[in-house]
């Protein structure tokens, strides 16, 4: 009954998490001051903090029900397990700032990927004893949020943004944010994100706004912020400049328009081609390549701009012009093309802007003023045709810039905006990576890092929006300058000093800052900067910044530049780049293709643990990840496999308690071989997994844990443990309990829910209200090796090889399951022979031999082996012979089998001999590798000789 109530309770919580519902503390507006870290924010989970685990008398159900994930998560959070401990650690705190998703967002697979990867790292470092801060938050998403609310107003029939006015519109946006802004973080909780939600940040929190203002003013004081006219991406539908990240490119088929550019004072003309005829009205030159003999005689002359009323522009030579493209003559419009703008700077050309903010032609368009840019395109071409200036049109495919939010074609134009001079800051970012202060994983992204920062352009940081950080600049009527200040009072003080009387009103710049400006301060502003808070001292610089490679420059590079500028330190030690999540065919997911996967649908069907494991295992840093539902199903089955192992162990581990540390060498030495083996392999896996996670080989760590559980623990040790009796029972139970707990601890960062649930059932029988696997120490120690027994590992690997050989013979000969074989085992290794003899029950269970008929001898001569017995060479010094009576197969078939085996070994020998005869290998390979190759060759030669002898014996018996 209790379990049924629990599952219903968990399902209710899952629904709340999916919708983003539940109680949430209202975030104050910018007008509400508060301390730098703010009050603890409450959980979005509308569930009481009960222990969602089975009682001592309740057995594990037959199947794992992942609907318990939600209630388990609520319990973790209520226990404060996501908050950094106060413990000291030699390596200091582990800090990972979460990339803040847009407050308007809904969880997608990109979010799911970073949540899984960052949560794995956070859980691992907590388990290693480091105070761990995974700091979450959301971004105000200026364009997206403003656009969303504007559309909501329109759908309601409410007054528009401009009709409401700035203050009332912002009140409406804050109301939307308070009501809906918690949805994305609630959905992240469904994935098990163990972020410290008590420190959750929003980029428009008052303390964050103070940091943004401080940063802007400091940059201005150093002369790094300026107001000027430069080329920007302009979104006519949004009426603002937008960042490169908010521009998407589509391959579209358009036209290339060929026309005559008449040479002034003659009948001669230059043939010119353009894809945007409307921009002719903004031309300020025509350029040709200085090496182009066709037009050399025209350089230095003037030509007449079509449909301009006779305006003339110069014909200039410039190396940028491609002789082979179009006609080889390039119309130059510095006001509306990025490349033309650069030519204009080189050639000192004037800039003419022909567009209004809404995409219509301004007064510089002459007779076309007021027309939409695309209507103008048609009209001016028709007029040019009528004037006899048209040569031809031809189809032309090009990459067209599209506004991600507005949906329309982006217009490059020169606009007066606020810019940050990034030259010096960019050089510091280059040095930080080159000097090793920052490590980029994978290393191949370093080349792109250097290339981008060494060629960085000044950063346009102003946006013509209302929602965001309003630029801290004030203007006074009748005064040509402006006042950049931390507050209006400070601006007034500056104005007085400039001779502006107090009766003159100050007007604040209406623009807001680029969202990337505030998020560029994220690693240090979230922990108290510009104040020297205890958190700033403890958690900055961050240890790792984990994010997608697609925002390496838009966000990561800017954080590095800002961190170095304002704190003098690199904001993080490591930049870990993950790839994009693609579909099972490795194609990019898109709505048009119909292959988009909603992670919440996957969680509903398979559970968060299965999705997390599918996203991160097999992942290589920086590589895109194909995701199929078959893979998720496999990992759901992995959850079930762990669950079933726990059900098998449950009666054996009654009263078990958490291990108080790793098994030490003395205890290990007293165990039987099988137990020494599984403990040694558990320790080996723990150390390898820890090393992989420390080195950010996250997928490799998950794979190792998976393979240890499946290939060593479940498939081998659990099976042989069923044969333990007498004095071995106690050692077996100790090894089972210990090895399974190691499994749970190694898998926990990847699959936190199922592992926590099982750990509580099997290892917290006392019902300690605060004990948690999440808070348990990682099995691998820092700075100390775990106990291991190399002899036990060697013996067990050989024993496993024997079992596999016996199974292979059965499979090849089609021996019925009920038939027990009686092999003769020739084993030259006395210790291995003793193990085989002592563990005949286990051998019988796993390979279906009759223990009473098994013979173990040191040499073939020591046994009475029939000449026609089937032989299999397991390894050097280990062979198996099965009598024909067990196989019921004829000699001819056995000769054929041995012949194929001998042929394969002969090929191996030829390959090894060829390698050793190759001077390039023998002379250049490490001596150890050469010696190992010689040893392999000797072993293969011996195996071939044994097989040849067996073949000869069989031939003689025919």
For every predicted segment, state its role:
Residues 1-25:
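N-terminal chloroplast transit peptides
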Residues 4, 60-62, 110, 137-140, ...:
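Conserved short loop/turn motifs at secondary-structure junctions
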Residues 17, 28-48, 52-54:
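N-terminal mitochondrial targeting presequences
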Residues 44-291, 316, 333-365, 384, ...:
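N-terminal, positively charged nucleic-acid-binding surface of large information/translation enzymes
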Residues 46-49, 258, 451-517, 521, ...:
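Feature 926 captures the class I aminoacyl-tRNA synthetase adenylation module centered on the KMSKS loop
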Residues 90-98, 120, 156-160, 185-192, ...:
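Active-site-adjacent bridging/hinge elements
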Residues 123-131, 152-163, 186, 190-195, ...:
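Secondary-structure transition/capping motifs at alpha-helix termini
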């Amino acid at each position: 009954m209790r379990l049924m109530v629990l599952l219903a309770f968990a399902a209710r919580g899952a629904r709340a998490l999916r919708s983003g519902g539940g109680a949430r503390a209202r975030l104050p507006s910018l007008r509400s001051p508060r301390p730098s870290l703010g009050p603890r924010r409450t959980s979005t989970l509308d569930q009481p903090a009960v222990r969602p685990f089975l009682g001592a008398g309740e057995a594990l159900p037959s199947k794992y029900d992942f609907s318990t994930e939600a209630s388990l998560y609520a319990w973790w959070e209520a226990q404060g397990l996501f908050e950094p401990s106060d413990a000291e650690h030699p390596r200091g705190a582990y800090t990972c700032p979460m990339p803040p998703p847009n407050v308007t967002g809904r969880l997608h697979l990109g979010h799911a990927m970073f949540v899984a990867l960052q949560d794995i790292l956070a859980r691992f470092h907590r388990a290693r004893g480091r105070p761990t801060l995974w700091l979450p938050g959301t971004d105000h998403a200026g364009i997206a949020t403003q656009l969303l609310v504007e559309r909501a107003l329109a759908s309601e029939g409410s007054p528009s943004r401009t009709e409401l006015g700035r203050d009332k519109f912002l009140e409406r946006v804050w109301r939307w944010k308070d009501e809906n802004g918690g949805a994305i973080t609630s959905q992240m909780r469904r994935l098990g994100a163990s972020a410290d939600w008590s420190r959750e940040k929003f980029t428009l929190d008052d303390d964050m706004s103070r940091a943004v203002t401080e940063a802007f003013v400091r940059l201005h004081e150093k002369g790094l912020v300026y107001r000027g006219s430069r080329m920007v991406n302009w979104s006519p539908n949004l009426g603002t400049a937008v960042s490169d990240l908010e521009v998407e490119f589509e391959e579209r088929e358009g036209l290339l328009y060929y026309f005559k550019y008449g040479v002034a004072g003659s009948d001669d003309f230059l043939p010119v081609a353009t894809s945007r005829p409307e921009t002719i009205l903004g031309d300020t030159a025509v350029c040709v390549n200085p090496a182009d003999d066709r037009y050399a005689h025209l350089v230095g002359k003037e030509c007449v701009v079509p449909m301009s009323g006779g305006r003339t522009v110069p014909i200039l030579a410039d190396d940028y012009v491609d002789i082979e493209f179009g006609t080889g003559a390039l119309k130059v419009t510095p006001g509306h093309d990025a490349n033309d703008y650069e030519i204009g700077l080189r050639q000192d050309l004037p800039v003419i802007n022909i567009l209004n903010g809404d995409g219509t032609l301004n007064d510089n368009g002459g007779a076309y003023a007021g027309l939409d840019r695309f209507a103008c395109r048609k009209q001016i071409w028709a007029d040019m045709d009528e004037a006899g200036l048209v040569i031809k049109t031809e189809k032309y495919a090009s990459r067209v810039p599209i506004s991600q939010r507005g949906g329309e074609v982006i217009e490059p134009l020169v606009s007066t905006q606020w810019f940050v001079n990034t030259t010096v800051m960019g050089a510091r970012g280059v040095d930080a990576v080159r000097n090793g202060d920052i490590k980029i994983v994978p290393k191949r992204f370093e080349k792109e890092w250097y290339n981008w920062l060494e060629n960085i352009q000044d950063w346009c940081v102003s946006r013509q929006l209302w929602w965001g950080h309003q630029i801290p600049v004030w203007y006074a009527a009748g005064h040509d300058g402006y006042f950049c200040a931390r507050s209006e009072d400070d601006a007034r003080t500056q104005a007085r000093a400039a001779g502006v009387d107090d009766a003159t009103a100050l007007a604040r710049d209406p623009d807001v800052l680029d969202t990337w400006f505030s998020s560029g301060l994220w690693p240090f502003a979230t922990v108290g900067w510009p104040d020297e808070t205890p958190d700033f001292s403890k958690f900055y610089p961050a240890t790792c910044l984990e994010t997608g490679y697609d925002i390496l420059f838009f966000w990561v590079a800017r954080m590095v530049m800002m961190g170095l500028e304002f704190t003098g330190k690199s904001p993080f030690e490591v930049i870990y780049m993950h790839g994009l999540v693609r579909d099972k065919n490795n194609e990019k997911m898109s709505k048009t293709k119909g292959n988009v996967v909603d992670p919440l649908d996957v969680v509903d069907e398979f559970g968060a643990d299965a999705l997390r494991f599918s996203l991160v295992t097999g992942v290589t840093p920086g590589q895109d990840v194909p995701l199929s539902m078959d893979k998720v199903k496999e990992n759901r089955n992995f959850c079930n496999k762990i669950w079933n192992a726990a059900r098998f162990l449950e009666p054996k581990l009654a009263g078990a308690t958490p291990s108080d540390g790793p098994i030490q060498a003395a205890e290990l030495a007293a165990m039987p071989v099988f137990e020494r083996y599984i403990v040694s392999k558990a320790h080996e896996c723990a150390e390898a997994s820890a090393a992989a996670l420390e080195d950010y080989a996250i997928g490799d760590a998950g794979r190792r844990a998976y393979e240890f559980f499946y290939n060593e623990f479940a498939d081998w040790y659990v099976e042989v443990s069923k044969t333990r009796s007498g004095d071995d029972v106690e050692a077996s139970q100790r090894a089972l309990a210990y090895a399974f707990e190691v499994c749970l601890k190694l898998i926990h960062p990847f699959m936190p829910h199922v592992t926590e649930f099982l750990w509580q059932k099997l290892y917290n029988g006392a019902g300690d209200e605060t004990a948690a696997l999440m808070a348990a120490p990682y099995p691998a120690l820092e700075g100390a090796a775990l106990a291991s027994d190399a002899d036990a590992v060697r013996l067990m690997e050989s024993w496993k090889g024997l079992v596999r050989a016996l199974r292979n013979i059965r499979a090849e000969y089609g021996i019925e399951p009920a038939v027990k074989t009686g092999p003769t085992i020739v084993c030259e290794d006395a210790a291995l022979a003793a193990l085989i003899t002592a563990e005949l029950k286990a051998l019988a269970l796993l390979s279906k031999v009759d223990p009473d008929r098994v013979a173990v001898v040191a040499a073939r001569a020591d046994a009475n082996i029939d000449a026609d017995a089937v032989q299999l060479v397991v390894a050097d010094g280990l062979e198996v012979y099965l009598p024909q009576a067990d196989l019921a197969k004829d000699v001819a078939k056995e000769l054929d089998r041995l012949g194929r085996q001998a042929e394969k070994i002969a090929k191996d020998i030829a390959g090894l001999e060829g390698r050793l005869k190759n001077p390039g290998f023998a002379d250049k390979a490490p001596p150890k590798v050469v010696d190992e190759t010689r040893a392999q060759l000797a072993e293969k030669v011996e195996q071939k000789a044994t097989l040849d002898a067996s073949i000869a014996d069989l031939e003689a018996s025919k």
